[in-house]
Amino acid sequence: MINLKLIETNFDEFNAKLKAKKVDEGVLKNLLDTYNELKIKKQELENLQAVQNAKSKEVGILARSGADTTLLKTELEENKKLMQTASNLVSELETKLDTVASRVPNVIDDDVPLGKDDNDNVCIKTILEPREFNFTPKEHFELGENLGWLDFATGAKLSGSRFTVLRSDGARLSRALVNFMIDFNTARGFELVNVPFLVNSNTLYGTGQLPKFEEDLYKIRDEDLYLIPTSEVPVTNIYNNEIIPVENLPIKMTCYSACFRQEAGSAGRDTRGMIRQHQFEKVELVSISKPEDSAKILDEMVSCASDMLKELGLPHRHMMLCSADLGFGAAKTIDLEVWLPGQGKYREISSISNTRDFQARRAKIRYKDGKKNALVHTLNGSSLAVGRTLIAIMENYQNSDGSINIPEVLKKYM
C-alpha cells in the first residue's frame, strides 16, 4: 500500500508516477479526498470526546457539592449520541479508504523508463551469444513429444488445457533443475524454507494479490484458503505483523513450490507447450531489508539468477521494465529473458522486483532500530522458473536427430 501521508504532501509527483502505470487521476484524487475527509472527521470525533470528558468531570464536581446536574447530564447524553454518529462515520471512512487504497498500485522508482507497453522495456545487457544451428531448431513441445518427455494429451485428460505430465528423462531433468537451483541459491546465502501451498486471504492481501487480482486465483470453496500463485506470498508473509531486530536484516530466503494461476487474461496466448500453464513450478528468492539496502539487494538477486543461467549455458538478456509494464506491487523490476531458438526470440524466465515498503505497509512488517520502528523493504523474484528453464535447455541443447544434451552442471543431479 502506498504512503498516504506522502500523497498529501506530494500529490503531483505521485499522480505523475501512477499515471505512468496507467492509473486514472480520479483514483488518486478520490483516495486523497477520502483521506482528508477521514482526518477531518477524526478531529471532530476527538473534539466531541474532549467535550464528553470535560462535562463528565464537571458533573462529578457538581454532584459532590450537592448542585443540580440534570442539565449537564442531558448535555452528556446528547453529546454521546453525536460521538456515536461521528464514530460510525469514521469507521465507514476508514473502510472506504482501505478499499480504495488497497487497489492503488505502487509508485515507480525515479530511474524506471516511461513507456506504454512491453515494447518500451529497455535492454540493459545481453549475456552469452545464441548458438548457431546447422539445422532448423525445433520448439520444445515437438522435441518433448517425440522424446516422450512431455505428455500434453494426458495432462489435458486429467485436468484440462494448460496442464502437462512430465515423463521419463523430462521428469528427471525437472527434478534435477529444482535441486540445482536450491543448491545454487543457498550457496549465495539464501535460507531454504518450505511453506504451505494454501494461504488465507490476509496473506494474499499482504503481498498485494487481494483484493485486486482475485479472478486470477484458485479459491477453495467455502474456505478462506487459496492456492498460491507464487511462493513469494507465503514466504514474504512469514514476517507478517512482526517487528524484526535490525541486526537480523537482511533476511534472504529461497523456496521451491508449485504455483497455480487461472491466467484469466491469457486466452489465445501460448496455447501450445509449457510456456503458460495453470500449474507450474519455480524456485523463488525473497529478501527483506532496511530501506537503504534494497537497491543493492535487487542487484544481488538479479546477479544470482543471471549467474545461474550462465552456469547452465543459456543465452539471456536483462530487461528493465517500463512504467506501464510493471506489476501492481513493484517499484522497479528487472526481467531476465532467455533465448529460445525454436521460437527465435527471448522469453521471460525470471522477474525480480523491489516493492520497497509497499508490501511491508500492507503486511505490517517492520524492523526495530534503537527505539524506532520502521517499515522494511521487500524484494522477490524467480531463480528460476523451472518449466521455462527446462524448455530453454531442450531448445538450446537439441541435436539434429531430436536428442537433447544435458548441461554439464546438471549431470550429477540426474
Curated annotation (Swiss-Prot):
Protein name: Serine--tRNA ligase
Domain of life: Bacteria
Known function: Catalyzes the attachment of serine to tRNA(Ser). Is also able to aminoacylate tRNA(Sec) with serine, to form the misacylated tRNA L-seryl-tRNA(Sec), which will be further converted into selenocysteinyl-tRNA(Sec).
Keywords: Aminoacyl-tRNA synthetase, ATP-binding, Cytoplasm, Ligase, Nucleotide-binding, Protein biosynthesis
Positions contributing to L-serine binding: 230-232, 284, 382
Pathway(s) it belongs to: Aminoacyl-tRNA biosynthesis; selenocysteinyl-tRNA(Sec) biosynthesis; L-seryl-tRNA(Sec) from L-serine and tRNA(Sec): step 1/1
Catalytic activity of the protein: tRNA(Ser) + L-serine + ATP = L-seryl-tRNA(Ser) + AMP + diphosphate + H(+); tRNA(Sec) + L-serine + ATP = L-seryl-tRNA(Sec) + AMP + diphosphate + H(+)
